[in-house]
Structures are given as structure tokens and as C-alpha cells.
């Protein structure tokens, strides 16, 4: 409330719960924009390069919380928030249920971040970094079309496994 200069009366935990579940999407964007603008304003000069780290992470839930789902990878009931950082700066913290594709919202958030950063620093190199769970072909094509470099993990597949075995055999195993 203080951050956005909005006066909303809160009476009880149930009111808080209703408030959290009914926040307009625009308000969430305003909150995230404050984080990004604070990051931008913390620089005296445009950086030569920025690496945006995208990381979905599990937040284990206890009890009967709204929106709780079991996630097979984490083997627990959890939320799956998407965190975006650049160096030590938090740029985005997006709470999501765990019954979705971990890459959901990544492309949209990356696009909004790139647009905002380039408004202030049009010549700064932007690098998208994420693990294999966020690697999507169309998004990487978008990165290339928009001059965004990327460092992403690739999910295992037969071609990578064959190449990996070749390199292990010929370059990493002592003879």
C-alpha cells in the first residue's frame, strides 16, 4: 500500500486472503515495474551487458492452502514461483501454482523486461539464462530475432547423449 500510494483498508486475515486473490493484474505489473525501475536507477551508467537469470523454484506448502498441487519433480505440494534476478537484484517474483508448465509466463516476462530495459539502455547486451525446464524453441527463436543472447540447459535426448558419450570417450577418459 505504501509503495503504491494506495489506501486500502484491511480488517482481518480473511480480508487479506480475498485481497491477495483479487489483486488486478495491472497492480501486479506496477509492483514488478517498481523492482525493475529500482534496478535501473541503481546504475550510474548503462551496463555493457546484463544477464537475466530465470529460475522457477518450489515453495513447499503445509496444510490445506488454496491452489496447492502435488509436483512430481519436487515430490511435494508446493507453489512454483518464477524468480528473475540480475546479479544481486530481484527483478520479478511471480507466484504460480505448481500444476503448470514451468516455462509458462517466461516468454511474456522476458519480453516485458527487455522492452523496459531497452527504453533506458538501448545498447546494453541482454543475456537470458535458464535451466532446461525453461528451454522452448519458439522463445529461443524470439531471442535471436530480438538480439537477445541466451544460455539455457538442454533437456537430455539421444543426439546429446551420443555426443556426450563421444566426448567422454575421446577427450575425458585417460588412456
Where are these regions (language model features)?
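Short, positively charged, Gly/Tyr-enriched micro-motifs
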Residues: 1-34, 84-91, 110, 118-119, ...
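Active-site-proximal, Lys/Arg-enriched surface segment
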Residues: 8-9, 13-82
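Generic beta-strand/beta-sheet core signal
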Residues: 55, 85, 93, 129-131, ...
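Short, glycine-/Ser/Thr-/acidic-enriched flexible segments
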Residues: 57-59, 89, 97-98, 155-157
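Short acidic, glycine/serine/threonine-rich loops at helix termini
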Residues: 61-67, 91-96, 137-142, 161-167
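Electropositive, glycine- and tryptophan-enriched low-complexity nucleic-acid-binding patches
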Residues: 72-121
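Domain-level cores of phosphate- or acyl-group-handling catalytic modules
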Residues: 100-159
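An anionic, glycine-rich sequence signature occurring as long contiguous blocks
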Residues: 149-175
